[in-house]
């Protein structure tokens, strides 16, 4: 259990930057890695803050170059968790950075299923029902 008195590296402003950048996640969509470049762009402010060393920053950016695809409207949720895990990785010696991508991959599918159902089906269906 961690103490609430621990000094956090990331501020609310840092998280807000990630939130606003997450809206551009689909801007660099490609068929090889889907939204990974958008994820890198969204997370880059916190990665630059957490890893001032160029080698560590390169490793962090490489970590987020892996395949990433989910409903774009739910990306801020995943990026918030990812930011917290990156902060733990930067401050804890015994943290395994492979868990960051494992958690991202574990959240992509379920959130895509929920997000697609809500944003792509339910909302359009209710809009079509209003037309009747």
Specify the residue positions occupied by each region the protein language model found.
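Intrinsically disordered, low-complexity regions enriched in small/polar residues
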Residues: 53, 99-102, 125
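Alpha-helical membrane-spanning segments of integral membrane proteins, especially the hydrophobic core
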Residues: 101-121
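Short, surface-exposed, charge-dense and proline/glycine-enriched linear segments
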Residues: 84-93, 104-110, 125
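Single conserved hydrophobic/aromatic residue that forms the stacking wall/gate
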Residues: 124-132
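The first (N-terminal) embedded transmembrane alpha-helix
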Residues: 36-38, 118-123
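Soluble N-terminal domains of membrane-associated systems
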Residues: 1-96
